[in-house]
């Protein structure tokens, strides 16, 4: 009889232990109802070739919302001249998942300004950045924009004799 009671006690303890391991915490999948917000580290950037390796600009953003679905959110970041309505935009980040910032050095940002936007040395260009967040299997898109200006420089030749 003692043997059956001990088996019954162990069976009940096992059931209690297994039922205590249920994880009902779904907050990691539910990004909540956060508003998508894009921010720039600086609103006015003057690039200097002597600091070519330093960080020039960082654009960072909040997660936005996945509407409680638990689905992944992908982000697309575009840059364009102010007032162009993103007609000929530079796509900095495309369909990135779990990426919440974009950072460029002085040299990298100057190259983007000169090669894509046609900037010349000393020219101050007003830019807009637009972040679009898309949730898998949802039609709604979340959009946030921010504005900043950048002054380019004319790099010295990279060929040395």
For each predicted feature, which ranges?
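Beta-strand signatures of extracellular beta-sandwich domains
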Residues: 74-78
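Intrinsically disordered, low-complexity boundary segments flanking structured domains
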Residues: 64, 79-80
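Insoluble glucan recognition modules
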Residues: 26-59, 63-73, 85, 99-128, ...
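Surface-exposed loop/edge segments in extracytoplasmic proteins
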Residues: 83-94
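Positively charged, phosphate-engaging catalytic surfaces used for nucleic-acid and nucleotide handling
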Residues: 23
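C-terminal motif of bacterial Sec signal peptides marking the signal peptidase cleavage site
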Residues: 16-20
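Bacterial N-terminal signal peptides that target proteins for export
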Residues: 1-9
């Amino acid at each position: 009889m003692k043997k059956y009671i001990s088996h019954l006690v162990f069976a009940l303890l096992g059931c209690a232990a297994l039922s205590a391991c249920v994880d009902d915490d779904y907050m990691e999948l539910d990004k909540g109802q956060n508003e998508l917000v894009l921010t720039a580290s600086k609103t006015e950037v003057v690039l200097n070739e002597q600091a070519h390796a330093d960080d020039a600009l960082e654009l960072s953003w909040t997660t936005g919302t996945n509407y409680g679905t638990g689905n992944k959110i992908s982000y697309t970041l575009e840059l364009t001249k102010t007032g162009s309505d993103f007609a000929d935009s530079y796509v900095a980040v495309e369909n990135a998942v779990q990426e919440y910032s974009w950072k460029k050095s002085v040299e990298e940002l100057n190259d983007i300004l000169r090669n894509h936007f046609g900037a010349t040395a000393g020219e101050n260009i007003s830019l807009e950045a637009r972040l679009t967040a898309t949730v898998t299997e949802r039609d709604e898109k979340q959009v946030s924009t921010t504005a900043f200006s950048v002054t380019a420089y004319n790099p010295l030749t990279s060929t040395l004799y």
